[in-house]
């Protein structure tokens, strides 16, 4: 599914302020990671990254490519490609708990300031 900024802001409201990361920071980071498209798959340095949050198959989810995956989120990677973001959010929070927001490389250079443009006016 191709989300809009406002749709995504609505769905991800529960993440606002989690571990000190604001909703506009998440929206910005997701935009620069996957363009709000749940179907995004990126192959990168022998890893494959899935979905809105670009969660990789080496550590966080399992697919048929990397064995063994640590599969910390205990989930099949293709679950991050559907429209239901519940499992994506659960895993993203685990990543944040363990790695911090810098797991998402876009965050520091692109999403740590000037965040007004990432707010949804309708909320």
Curated annotation (Swiss-Prot):
GO cellular component term of the entry, any: extracellular region
GO terms classed as biological process: defense response to Gram-negative bacterium; defense response to Gram-positive bacterium; lactose biosynthetic process
Subcellular location, principal: secreted
Keywords in alphabetical order: Calcium, Disulfide bond, Lactose biosynthesis, Metal-binding, Milk protein, Secreted
GO molecular function, one term: lactose synthase activity
Xref: Gene3D superfamilies: 1.10.530.10
Tissue-by-tissue expression: Mammary gland specific. Secreted in milk.
Domain C-type lysozyme intervals: 1-123
Annotated Pfam families: Lys
Coiled coil regions, renumbered to chain: none
SUPFAM superfamilies: Lysozyme-like
Compartmental location: Secreted
Binding positions (Ca(2+)): 79, 82, 84, 87-88
Disulfide bonds, paired cysteine numbers: 6-120, 28-111, 61-77, 73-91
InterPro entries the record matches: Glyco_hydro_22, Glyco_hydro_22_CS, Lactalbumin, Lysozyme-like_dom_sf
Quaternary state and interactors: Lactose synthase (LS) is a heterodimer of a catalytic component, beta1,4-galactosyltransferase (beta4Gal-T1) and a regulatory component, alpha-lactalbumin (LA).
Protein family (similarity comment): Belongs to the glycosyl hydrolase 22 family.
Role: Regulatory subunit of lactose synthase, changes the substrate specificity of galactosyltransferase in the mammary gland making glucose a good acceptor substrate for this enzyme. This enables LS to synthesize lactose, the major carbohydrate component of milk. In other tissues, galactosyltransferase transfers galactose onto the N-acetylglucosamine of the oligosaccharide chains in glycoproteins.
This protein's name: Alpha-lactalbumin A
């Amino acid at each position: 599914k191709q989300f809009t900024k406002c749709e995504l802001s609505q769905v991800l409201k529960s993440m606002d302020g989690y571990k000190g990361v604001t909703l506009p920071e998440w929206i910005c980071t997701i935009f620069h990671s996957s363009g709000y498209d749940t179907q995004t798959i990126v192959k990168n340095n022998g890893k494959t990254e899935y979905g809105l949050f670009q969660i990789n198959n080496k550590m966080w989810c399992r697919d048929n490519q990397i064995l063994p995956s640590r599969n910390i989120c205990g989930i099949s990677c293709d679950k991050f490609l559907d429209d239901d973001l519940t499992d994506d959010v659960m895993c993203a929070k685990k990543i944040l708990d363990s790695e911090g927001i810098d797991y998402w490389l876009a965050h520091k250079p692109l999403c740590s300031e000037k965040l007004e443009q990432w707010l949804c006016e309708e909320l």
